[in-house]
Amino acid sequence: EITNLPECHLPFLQYIAVEAVGKPNGSWRRIAQGEGLRGWTIKTQNNIFGYSDWNINRPANAWYCTHLWQHYAYNNDLEYLRNIAFPVMQSTCKYWFDRLKENKDGKLVAPDEWSPEQGPWEDGVAYAQQLVWQLFNETLHAVEALKKVDIQIDNVFVSELADKFRKLDNGVSVGSWGQIKEWKEDKGKLDFQGNDHRHLSQLIALYPGNQISYHRDTLLADAAKVTLQSRGDMGTGWSRAWKIACWARLFDGDHAYRLLKSALSLSTLTVISMDNSKGGVYENLFDSHPPFQIDGNFGATAGIAEMLLQSNQGFIHLLPALPLAWSDGSVAGLRTEGDFTFTMKWNAGWLTQCSVLSGSGLKCRIYSPKGLIARVENSSGKRIPISLIKGGLIEFPTKKGE
């Protein structure tokens, strides 16, 4: 979505909708039924025919739903939200309504879950909690968007969703050495300083989620930084790509850039390896786990986009993680939530020019610490009034197609 290729996202979204709710006796629904639960869920590996295998990965149903919501957030297509995204999100919520249980602290937790790909199975693992939080939060936003245009939603469902969300453990807490805890109980396990495991499962809330941000909570963002520092900069190809995006979300462009260079280091190994030193790319720029895994290519591209433009906190942040190596430059065609397409130029690290194309005619809210926006004009050169929200955050009206 951020690279302005939503048509490349749609086949995956349609696949999710068909397999999750379009087949009454589909394999994804049968997994949930086998557990005595409503809704659907999946395992780690899934093919184009809906076959799911290797290991149960229940929270991945919530992860899939983040894609469904993201497409709406970028396109504002209410028919898509009503007919494709929301039915899947609602079904997924019902799965978790049935599965969550109350912990001794009174919070709702996902029982017997894993932190991919290490450690014990236990209740309230950060990976599961953060994804269920994201699911419930985005489904509530979907309900709000549909109700604004008088689309009727089951009130019993909405009430239960709000109640479960209020009681849910959000999966984000700080541990004994200042890290985001990977497991609910801080007993050491594998959650020790210096563990350089390739996965960042406890940082789903940083990226691709939006629960951790310096715009929200400095303490939690600092803890995410401690966690990333502990994991180190090495990793499989896709792991390095994930770290690029995470450092971009923490507004550290120089660190993200170092990881980008690392992700582009030459790899020659073509057999399966979990050695963190073997990741990179092959001579044809295919990502090397090793062997080839395309998520590293997609992830690195997404990370670069995150360095230049972010919109995950309800406003658009221009040049949030610009590295010193890119002090002068330009970019065209990147897209944000709210259906805005941006062209930007900068010099010596400061924004010098910015144009915005509004795809839906919504109000545009921008945060630009890398350059003061003193004047906004429409395509005819007429000045548009700016509202100053707070702390460098501005808002102005837009017209669809301009």
Q: What is the predicted role of each segment?
A:
Residues 1-21, 46, 53, 57-75, ...:
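Active-site core of glycosidic bond-cleaving carbohydrate-active enzymes
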Residues 22-41:
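Surface-exposed loop and adjacent secondary-structure segments within mature catalytic domains
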